[in-house]
Amino acid sequence: MIITIDGPSGTGKSTLAKALAQTLQFLYCNTGAMYRTLAYARLQPDWQEVPLEDFLASPPFSFSFSKDSPLQAFYGDRLLTSELSSQEVANFASLFSKEPLVRAYMQTLQKQYATVGNCVFEGRDMGSKVFPHAEVKIFLTAKPEIRAERRLKDLPQGSLSKEALMAELIARDQADQQRECDPLVIPQDATVIDSSDLTISQILEKILPLIPSHLT
């Protein structure tokens, strides 16, 4: 079974997807982290001038995904963790993900991971493009100020003001919604949930009744 959770940044997708996967004993795949991994690798000096086709044909990054562990990202042999949370990487990932070659490459990987077992996929086009026939589709929204407060917790203290981050989030929304290749849209048949004033437990209470009873 595939469950998709889509929505813009700061709506609580990652926290919800992890909690839902843990509750159901499903695998969890953070596809945003996959795009940020590509962006991080592309920003490294040795790879900035390499043609995109060559970069993707012999990538300096890799992923580990199995029933025993969530998605892990590597640059060479080094496990990437905090590197993927920087605003520079996030901003470049937004630009880089517009490339049709990049999206096709990533979507192929994501579909391969779906064969491993029951999975919760989190991203921006999971229910609309990658898994349009997913059994359960969730689309999260939240007020911009709430989203900015949440994202600030992931950034080094003092690196950005709430107002500046909120402006960046709104600009990212517009870019995601207006890109020609797989824009951010509410998937057909998706359940839309505003997470602004809800806890993760309250959101789970809305979602679990959508799951077949033998899996909950």
UniProtKB/Swiss-Prot annotation:
It comes from the Bacteria. One of its GO terms (molecular function) is dCMP kinase activity. The keyword Nucleotide-binding applies. GO terms for cellular component: cytosol. Its EC number is 2.7.4.25. It holds the Pfam family Cytidylate_kin. ATP binds at G7, P8, S9, G10, T11, G12, K13, S14, T15. Gene3D superfamilies: P-loop containing nucleotide triphosphate hydrolases (3.40.50.300). It is found in: Cytoplasm. Belongs to the cytidylate kinase family. Type 1 subfamily. This is Cytidylate kinase. It comes from Chlamydia trachomatis serovar D (strain ATCC VR-885 / DSM 19411 / UW-3/Cx).
